[in-house]
């Protein structure tokens, strides 16, 4: 989704590439060199709204509100975004990191509503500093509504301590937001490590 170290771990990608030499890597415009410098081939860069089709899977790179950098001199020299995955069976949206914006309304208008959406819910405190680039759980719920996703799964919480909120706070605030809006608990869920969500059509 973007080149921040907690989202683009080059050592993990090198291992994936070695175990799967035919793997194709889709990255935002400007990030290909990060992979090719480490010997990873089959890398394609994408601008917003560009897509690729592999077998029966169509992947479209979508705009979100965030930023990029891996060092001091490369801020916003590459893109950031979400990915919209389409198959004949279902559509899934992965938001990457994002602040709240109208990008999600545009994504729904251009690509349709996803059955599933993976939306970040953590790393938002203090909000005066983080809100532009990281949604809080209430804004994450609004993204799910903007996308008209049938079901959403909260991500980007409980793994790395990046900001000031308690590790357990994002799911609690999400449940409060669902209750406040009169939405069922299973409309937008969170999973603990080892949990899974069965995806069926």
Region roles according to the model:
Residues 5, 31-32, 50:
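Alpha-helix capping/helix-boundary segments
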Residues 46-112, 176, 193-201:
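Core dinuclear metal-dependent hydrolase active-site scaffold
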Residues 12, 24-26, 30-33, 91, ...:
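Cap/insert and terminal regions of metallo-dependent hydrolase folds
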Residues 35-47:
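Helix-loop-beta element that forms the nucleotide-linked donor phosphate-binding surface
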Residues 2-7, 66-68, 94, 134, ...:
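Histidine-centered active-site/metal-ligand motif
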Residues 1-19:
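Di-metal (Zn2+ and/or Mg2+/Mn2+) metal-binding site signature of metallo-dependent hydrolases
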Residues 43, 59, 187-188:
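Generic structural signal for residues in well-ordered beta-strands
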Residues 13-22, 86-92:
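Short, surface-exposed connector motifs at secondary-structure boundaries
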């Amino acid at each position: 989704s973007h080149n921040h170290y907690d989202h683009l771990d080059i050592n993990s990608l090198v291992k994936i590439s070695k175990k799967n030499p035919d793997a194709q890597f889709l990255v935002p415009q400007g990030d290909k060199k990060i992979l090719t410098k480490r010997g990873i081939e089959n890398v394609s860069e994408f601008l917003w709204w560009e897509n690729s089709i592999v077998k029966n899977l169509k992947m479209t790179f979508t705009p979100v509100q965030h930023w990029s950098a891996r060092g001091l001199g490369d801020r916003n020299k590459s893109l950031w975004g979400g990915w919209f995955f389409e198959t004949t069976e279902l559509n899934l949206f992965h938001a990457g990191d994002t602040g709240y914006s109208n990008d999600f309304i545009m994504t729904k208008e251009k690509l349709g509503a996803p059955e599933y959406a993976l939306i970040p819910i953590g790393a938002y405190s203090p909000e005066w500093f983080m809100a532009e680039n990281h949604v809080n759980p209430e804004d994450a719920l609004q993204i799910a509504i903007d996308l008209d996703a049938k079901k959403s799964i909260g991500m980007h919480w409980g793994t790395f301590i990046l900001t000031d909120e308690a590790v357990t706070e994002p799911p609690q605030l999400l449940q409060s937001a669902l209750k406040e809006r009169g939405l069922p608990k299973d409309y937008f869920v969170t999973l603990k490590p080892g949990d899974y969500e069965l995806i069926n059509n």
